[in-house]
C-alpha cells in the first residue's frame, strides 16, 4: 500500500511562535534536544522519511504512517480500554528537557492537551496532532504532509481542537 503514502514536504523556515529555548537547544551541538531530533541519524531529514525503509522501520517514537481517521480511531479505542486510568495518570511533570517547556506525561502520552486536564495525546512531526478527551469521549486527529516549522500544532489547529472538544 506504499502508493497511498503521501510525500512529506519539509517546512519552510519562518519566524514561528515556538519557544526560543527549544530552537536554541535544537541548534546546540550535543544538546539533548538535538540528539533526540537527530535520532536515528540516517532518518533525521524529512526526505529520508519518504522512503519505504523508514515506513517499515517501526520506530516507537517516530515515523508513524497512517490517516487522520486511523489515528482518531486509535485514540477512540484507547478511551474504552481498562488501562486508560493508568495510561493518563501523571508520571512526570516539569521542565521537558527535550522540548524545553513545562510538560506533563502519562505512559507515552502528553497530558492536558485540550480544553480540560483529561485530554491526552501527542503532537507529531510537522504539525500533526492526535488526542482524546476523556470527559467528552471524543478523539481527534489531524495529519499533514506539508510540514510546518512548529514543534506543536499552530493556533488554527488548536482552535479546531478546542471548538470540537
Per-range role (PLM):
Residues 1-165:
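Catalytic loop of the DD-peptidase/beta-lactamase superfamily, centered on the K-T-G motif
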Amino acid at each position: 500500500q506504499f502508493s497511498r503514502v503521501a510525500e512529506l514536504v519539509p517546512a519552510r523556515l519562518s519566524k514561528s511562535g515556538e519557544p526560543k529555548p527549544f530552537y536554541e537547544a535544537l541548534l546546540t551541538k550535543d544538546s539533548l534536544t538535538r540528539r533526540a531530533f537527530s535520532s536515528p541519524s540516517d532518518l533525521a531529514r524529512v526526505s529520508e522519511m519518504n522512503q519505504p525503509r523508514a515506513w517499515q522501520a517501526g520506530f516507537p517514537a517516530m515515523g508513524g504512517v497512517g490517516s487522520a481517521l486511523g489515528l482518531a480511531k486509535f485514540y477512540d479505542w484507547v478511551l474504552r480500554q481498562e488501562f486508560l486510568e493508568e495510561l493518563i495518570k501523571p508520571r512526570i511533570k516539569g521542565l521537558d528537557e527535550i522540548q524545553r517547556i513545562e510538560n506533563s506525561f502519562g505512559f507515552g502520552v502528553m497530558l492536558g492537551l485540550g480544553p480540560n486536564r483529561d485530554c491526552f495525546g501527542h503532537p507529531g512531526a510537522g504539525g500533526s496532532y492526535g488526542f482524546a478527551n476523556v470527559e467528552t469521549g471524543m478523539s481527534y486527529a489531524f495529519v499533514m504532509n506539508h510540514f510546518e516549522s512548529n514543534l506543536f500544532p499552530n493556533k488554527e489547529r488548536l482552535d479546531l481542537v478546542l471548538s470540537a472538544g
